[in-house]
Amino acid sequence: MDFSFMKTGVASTNSSVSNNTNDMLNILELFASNALKNSSRYVELCGRNGITPEDIKYGLVYEVFEFFNRPNNLQDLRDIESLNKEEMDISEDIDDNIVEDSELDSFKRIDIETITNEEDIGFVVKLYSYYDNWDTWEPKTMTEQILQNSINKIKI
């Protein structure tokens, strides 16, 4: 007898596993990209010449709380997927934007009172709040727990 018409409801093809892996990698890429943008924005507000490891940690912590609230995530994920499908020349002048460690300004928090733009003030207030409360924050989801554990492993 042929039972090929019976399905379990669970796809076990390599294609679906590959698609899920690609989706997760795209989400992770978007998360990391947003975190670096947060870090860069903060460094610019501070008037420093480059991003330190501590800036990156601040940006990652900020993104844990903001990522799922961003209205453009779906479109941004589509953009990342399209970019990843294209063959890109990564040899752009990436070295032009790198500051040597010996020339990098030390991490220093900016005094919020020196910021004049309301949007920037809101960003820094949230950034500081998220970071300052990070050690006592209790993740509500498995994803948040994984992110917290990963970020806590960053040595500064």
Regions found by a protein language model. Name each.
Residues 1-50, 57-156:
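Intrinsically disordered, low-complexity terminal regions
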